[in-house]
Amino acid sequence: MKKIAVSTWCTDDYAVYLRPDRLEKCINHFHPEIDFHVFGTEETENVTKDHPWLGADNVKFSDWMMVATCLPLVEDYDMVIHMDADCFCLGSLDRVIESDAELIGVRNNNFFGKAGSAQPCTSPFYEPYGSGQIGVNDFINAGFVASNDKQFWYEWRDFNKFVAEQSDGRVFNYQPWPMIRNEQDTWNHIFHAENKYTSEIIDQEGSGVTYGIINQWGDKDHCESWKKLYMKDGMVYLDHPITGEPLRTSVLHAAGVGTMETIKDYGDQYNWLYGMISEEVADHIKSIVGD
């Protein structure tokens, strides 16, 4: 059986509001075999011991921390999954776990071709990784990253380090790649690189599932769609906004939607979520986390 770890980055000052302990409960409810790791305050304070480049004056370390939080795990696990701390696990991660692809990603842009209620994310696809454009349906979100290949994490670190060191703290100076500015951009380039890794976007159109911010849409608010989540056969679903197809929804990702100021007003992000979703879905989550 595949040995799997989930990692999230959450320092103590954020943990009281984002509640990674509840994320752990939800993941272990569906997958007791998965080990959950929080890269917390102590690890963050010591990160430059192993990654001195993250402490450079010209590097905004929060744009490049993801690999550093996962690398301590890659030698001990067959699969490592990164989940942002503002994710909610509502169901099985089976599509991820069962994938044999070396890299597993989730879409950034929704069924209307937008990033929530905002404009879509796309990127030029720079050589030597590719050419042309990483388009609306292919651009992936770095809030949920999984890999069955440990070498990927080292390559991603090296790519991040190279790009970060080209910055003066404000502007990126490496002219061949002017639009690669953070780890989401580097993730997209490695994921889609030609003749490199096998890759799978698990929530593509027609997959019947959602695993991230693809399930966000609305006229004014990114997550108006979450009000339409419902329970069926003990699982959380959201209907496709165009075709009406029921989509099994395993992960919600706030992705900055609930600002920390708003979350603090609710006490934590789970109370914020409960105030937005239906009572039956809220009760489902509460039964898992013990609220």
Positions of the model-derived regions?
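Aromatic-acidic/polar surface patches that form glycan- and anion
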Residues: 9-20, 60-62, 134-138, 145, ...
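N-terminal anchoring/stem segment of glycosyltransferases
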Residues: 1-58, 76, 267-291
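Short glycine- and hydrophobic/aromatic-rich loop-to-beta-strand nucleating segment
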Residues: 143-151
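Short, flexible, basic/aromatic active-site loop/helix in glycosyltransferases
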Residues: 122-135
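A glycosyltransferase accessory/donor-loop signature
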Residues: 135-136, 151-291
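Active-site regions of enzymes building and remodeling cell-envelope glycoconjugates
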Residues: 44-69, 80, 101-104
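Short, charged, surface-exposed secondary-structure boundary motifs
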Residues: 47-49, 61-62, 112-120, 262
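GT-A fold catalytic core of metal-dependent nucleotide-sugar glycosyltransferases
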Residues: 66-119
